[in-house]
Amino acid sequence: NIEVKAGEIVGIAGVEGNGQLELVEVITGLATPDQGQLLINGVNLTKASILERRKYMAFVPQDRALMGSCLNASIKENLIMTHYKLNPEFTRHGHILNDKKSTEFAYEIREKFDIQLHSIEDEMKSLSGGNQQKVILGRELLLSAPFILLDQPTRGLDVGSIEYVHQQIIRMSKENRAILLLSSDLEELFRITDRILVLHRGQIVANLITNETNINEVGYLMLEGAAHGA
């Protein structure tokens, strides 16, 4: 079982290929679990559609180019993804996109997340990797969902962008969001999480308080699936 409380940042540590992809797919609705339930704020989302889950869940995927964005679409279009399906203010007569609302919202995210761009009408691929990640983060975090799933959110980013992402994650936890962070960077997990769950061969083999463990212990658990000497 994985439980993440409101205001808590829980990290998932594990050697890649030990069930991380399957975990993300089950949580987001891309795969059906063999057993168990997915509950967010007491709402059973186990059989809910992907769109229904998005009312309760923000998701920053590992592959920002293929899953997190559409590089050939405009920055504005990327910023309103999901929002226009969940918020009726983004459409008129149920189908026509409200361009005024979409533009205002895009500029709001640009300001809040300090996205460096020339025009919101430019293609997403015109942005640096760090600014692309800011677009995805801004879009997802403004969903106001109680649960945030982050899959390798800083992979491939420069030091400044990594620090910015960490600040946003911590800010969201202070807003009482429950955050689950998958990362192959143990230093990242030790820097910002409250607890670390170790994933080994598809099973959670340890549930550790971050400031009561160390990188060596977590690393050993990742490799062996049990504590040293157990």
State what each model feature region is:
Residues 163-175:
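Helical segment within the ABC ATPase nucleotide-binding domain
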Residues 152-153:
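Walker B catalytic motif
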Residues 183-184:
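H-loop/switch region of ABC-family ATPase nucleotide-binding domains
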